[in-house]
Amino acid sequence: MFNTYILELVNSLHIMNKKTESLETIAVIHCAHEDFPRTVALIEVDPLLTDRIKIEMAYELTNSHDVEWWKNKEVTKMFPNKTCRSSDVGDQVLIEDRKYAFNGERGATIARVDR
């Protein structure tokens, strides 16, 4: 399970590296409950993080906890409606040319999607 402390630590490291490192943009694609895949969010992450941490961040940042997920500062909303469901098992994350699917509780387990 993704720890909130780790997310806060990653965010603080990101702030420290922001001036010297360019950010990487990853995409969250909802396809678990839709007729066709839809990119719902772009998320800026530190490129030095592992794919695993980037995926954990993508899952946490696209789930509503205390506030709607699209209001997170790291998230660029890509859906046309006023609201959008939270990410779920079966949804995907695109990191460069690598696509992963959330396939466990709270995104803790990931699977590489074949091209």
What is the meaning of each model-derived region?
Residues 11, 36, 42, 65, ...:
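A generic structural signal for solvent-exposed, polar alpha-helical segments
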Residues 2-56:
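N-terminal disorder-to-order initiation segments that are Gly/Lys/Arg-biased
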Residues 44-95:
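Short, conserved turn/kink motifs that form compact alpha/beta structural patches or helix kinks used as
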Residues 12, 35-37, 68, 98-103:
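Catalytic phosphate/metal-binding cores of nucleic-acid and nucleotide-processing enzymes, i.e., regions
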Residues 83-115:
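Short, compact, well-ordered microdomains
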